[in-house]
Regions:
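Bacterial N-terminal signal peptides that target proteins for export
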Residues: 1-10
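Bacterial N-terminal signal peptides
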Residues: 9-20
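N-terminal low-complexity, intrinsically disordered patches enriched in charged
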Residues: 18-20, 96, 173, 326
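N-terminal periplasmic/intermembrane-space "pro-region" immediately following the signal or transit peptide
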Residues: 21-90, 97-102, 212, 356-370, ...
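Glycine/serine-rich loop-strand microenvironments at binding/catalytic pocket rims
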Residues: 26-28, 33-53, 75, 158-161, ...
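Outer-membrane beta-barrel pore domains
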Residues: 46-47, 56-62, 99, 108, ...
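Outer membrane beta-barrel
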Residues: 71-272, 340-375, 380-397
């Protein structure tokens, strides 16, 4: 309830800042860093997206007012102030060789299933060239319907300030918008170990020539939406400090390496005493690890990431390690080895139709139905592959004489793991329509904890249909 009040307060502040001031946009708010990127949540949004959407805006006369089409409906309220209206629809069809129980009332196994994954509406834009803002709501969510609700002060590119509800600055994959993902689902480490969204405040910006060094540092109410559970018996991190540092050493050069980036990130949280909410699920939300481990102390994350997008290709990789302390949780009241979740992924893509990955494939070179005489082609086609692994257990997994156990106060926690290989094809018909097909091979370390105790490896097939404007 408190979080909802904060979110609604930020939304009201956005409206209050916008309405009285549109005529002043001609005189204030010039950015100090001309090539700076948008806020942290849009870290992975392609430069071509912004350029294409606001090409008309660059050509307008000073103080232009009214509705226009900038790739989506947009209301302009003078120079430097606009409201873009956004709609995002995503539906999925899937089938798995494993025994699925997404519908507890269903008696049929391995049936083809379908769902509307996202139905979101929202607004975003600028105010006087010195603020960015976004307000987005999920139409079908009964719990936590507000997604991104923030205001970002961007007048000084080396020290911008964002406040509201947005994604904690941790993990490249988690901070990539769902409309821009290379696969239907994020990696397991991003989904299960990264924080996700929370209410907080963050300072971020770029340093050094051409902004080759980027930082993000924030303070958040809790440990993020990914860590929350409906059952209040499970605990997650309270007040959280998070930071991320990203370097692009060749950003100022016109070379194939100018997009190469590497970064590190961390979070640290107070962790109240209770049962850890850390769990293991497959991409189809089937449990493969549900421990009842008592924790107490601090929750800490470290992450390492790298990305390179030369021409039509891309390569991305991450490593994430999360630990929950277990202070005083033994039967004798002594400390136990921290509870651990960690993993990695490596992924690659190839735009076979020739588009440059760093500039975005949602603006195909020859989109389907491009003009009034249909001089388009098939759009953009992309091949993708990803290998990943996530595992859970204790930090000290080899203590002499200790036997792994599922007991809440076990000295060594019995863990589990999931190794997955994903193969995908992405079709970008035009800037609004995208279809993704994924074939996934999962291998559960201890299948008796997974969706099918008699089957350690299984295939899943997923198709996503997306409309985004």
């Amino acid at each position: 309830m408190k979080q909802n009040r904060i979110v609604l307060g930020v939304a009201a502040l956005v409206a209050a800042v916008m309405l009285p001031w549109p005529a002043l946009g001609q005189e204030v708010g010039q950015q100090t860093v001309p090539d700076k990127e948008s806020p942290a949540e849009k870290e992975s949004e392609k430069p071509a997206d912004k350029a294409a959407e606001h090409q008309a805006s660059d050509k307008k006369t000073d103080g232009d007012w009214g509705f226009r089409w900038d790739g989506r409906p947009s209301l302009h309220l003078g120079e430097g102030t606009r409201v873009d209206f956004r709609v995002r629809l995503q539906s999925e069809i899937w089938h798995s060789d494993a025994t699925l129980s997404l519908d507890d009332d269903s008696d049929a196994d391995n049936d083809l299933s379908a769902d509307v994954a996202r139905r979101r509406i929202g607004i975003e834009g600028e105010i006087l060239n010195i603020f960015d803002y976004q307000v987005e709501r999920e139409l079908t969510a009964n719990r936590d319907p507000w997604r991104d609700v923030y205001l970002n002060y961007k007048q000084y590119g080396f020290a911008e300030v964002m406040a509201g509800k947005f994604k904690v600055p941790f993990s490249l994959d988690e901070n990539t918008s769902s409309t821009n993902l290379d696969f239907v689902n994020r990696s397991r480490i991003a989904t299960l170990l990264a924080p996700g969204r929370d209410v907080g405040v963050m300072v971020h910006g770029r340093f050094l020539p051409r902004g080759i060094l980027r930082y993000e540092l924030g303070l958040f109410n809790e440990d993020g939406s990914n860590a929350e559970r409906n059952d209040t018996d499970y605990v997650h991190g309270d007040r959280t400090v998070a930071g991320r540092l990203l370097v692009q050493p060749f950003r100022s050069r016109k070379s194939v390496a100018n997009d190469l980036a590497a970064g590190v990130s961390f979070t640290t949280s107070e962790l109240p005493e209770g049962v850890s909410g850390l769990r293991g699920r497959t991409e189809l939300d089937e449990w493969f690890y549900r421990p009842e481990v008592l924790v107490n102390g601090r929750r800490q994350r470290i992450g390492v990431e790298a990305r390179w997008r030369p021409g039509p290709f891309s390569v991305k990789s991450e490593f994430i390690r999360l630990t929950d302390e277990r202070l005083g949780e033994s039967i004798e009241g002594t400390d136990l080895s921290p509870f651990l979740g960690q993993g990695w992924y490596v992924s690659g893509t190839w735009a076979v139709t020739g588009e440059k990955k760093a500039e975005g494939l949602d603006a195909p070179l020859r989109p389907l139905f491009r003009g009034p005489f249909f001089k388009g082609w098939i759009g953009a086609v992309e091949l993708a592959a990803r290998a990943e692994r996530i595992r859970f257990g204790s930090v000290d997994s080899e203590i002499s004489g200790a036997v792994p156990s599922t007991a809440p106060r076990a000295e060594i926690v019995l863990g589990n793991s999931d190794r997955a290989y994903t193969f995908g094809v992405n079709w970008y018909a035009n800037r609004w329509i995208k279809i993704q097909l994924n074939l996934v091979r999962n291998t559960i370390g201890f299948p008796d904890q997974g969706p099918n105790p008699e089957q350690s490896s299984f295939w899943s097939r997923i198709v996503r249909f997306q409309f985004s404007m």
